[in-house]
Each structure stands twice: as C-alpha cells, then as structure tokens.
C-alpha cells in the first residue's frame, strides 16, 4: 500500500513539473 502511495506522489510531482496543472494532481490523488 505504501509503495503504491509513494509511486502516486512521484507521478504527481512529474506531472506538476511537466504540465504545471494542479487539477491533474487532484485527479491522480483521487485515482490513487
């Protein structure tokens, strides 16, 4: 469970850096 959570945080960080889109981060948090 923790591994998956860490992976989600990494994915969110990458998306924020590439797209700078907060809404996408929220969507990923919901999915994860």
Swiss-Prot record:
Q: Which domain of life is it from?
A: Eukaryota
Cellular component (GO) terms are:
cytosol; nucleus
**Protein name per its UniProtKB record:** Uncharacterized protein C1711.15c
Q: What organism does the UniProt record list as the source?
A: Schizosaccharomyces pombe (strain 972 / ATCC 24843) (Fission yeast)
């Amino acid at each position: 469970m923790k591994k998956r959570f860490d992976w989600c945080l990494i994915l969110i960080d990458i998306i924020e850096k590439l797209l700078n889109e907060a809404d996408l981060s929220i969507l990923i948090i919901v999915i994860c």
